[in-house]
Amino acid sequence: MGKKPVQGGRASARRSGGWGKKRLKGFWLWLTVSMVMVVVYFFVATLYRVPSRAMENTLRAGDYLLLDKLHYGPQLPFGLGTLPGLGKVEAGDLVVFQIPDDPSRVYIKRCIATSGQVVEIINKATFVDGIRVADPPYSKYIDARIRSGSNSTRDNLSPFEVPEGSLFLIGDNRDNSRDSRNWGAIPQQSVLGRGLVVMFSVRPKEEEQSRWDSILDFPSRVRWERIGTWLQ
C-alpha cells in the first residue's frame, strides 16, 4: 500500500510532462504560422482596397485586390530597400504605389510609359513615343469638354520624357483621376506591387447611413459578381 502514492505521483508527473509537451508544440506551431504570415504579407502578397473611383470601370471603389509583391520585388520594411523581382513594370500593368511626398497615401493606376519613353496627350488621346495608345477596355471619359494645356494637363500634355527609374501612371477614369498628369513621374522604388484579381468587393456605404444601418445593409452592398475577376 505504501507504493501507491509513489505510482500516483509518477503518473501525475507523466501527465504533467505530456501536457507541457503539447503546450510547447502548440507554441511552435503558432510561431511558425505567424512567421509564415509575416513573410507572405511583406514579401509575397496582401490585400489592397481600392479607395476611389479613379480607376472605373476597370476597378470599383470598395474592390479588394490581391496585391502581388513578388513580381516587381518586395520592399523591405523600415526603408531598407527592395529585393530583386521576377519582372519589371510594363506598360498596361496595374501598379499599386505610394505617393513619394506622403507614403501613407497608396493608390493604384495603370502604367502608360516607363523610363526614357516620351508621353504626350492631345485632346484626351494619349501618345507614347509618337504612337497612339489604345484606351484600356474598361476605361471611360465622363467629361466631353477639352481643356487646353495652359489651364490643365488632364486633356493636353506637352511631350514629357519619363526620367530614368520612373513610371508614368494614369487612372482609367481619365477625367476623374489625379495621377502622373498632375504629379509627374513616379519613382519605381515607390511601387508596392501589381493588382491581380478582385478577391472581394463591397459598395461603400452612403455618407448619411449610420454604422448600424450599414451593417444591416452589408449583404446587399456586396458585389458578388466581381469576386474572382482577373484584372486587365
Task: Label each residue range with its predicted role.
Residues 2-27, 39, 43-49, 53-232:
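Soluble "head" domains of membrane/secretory-pathway proteins
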Residues 29-37:
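Hydrophobic alpha-helical membrane-embedded or membrane-associated segments
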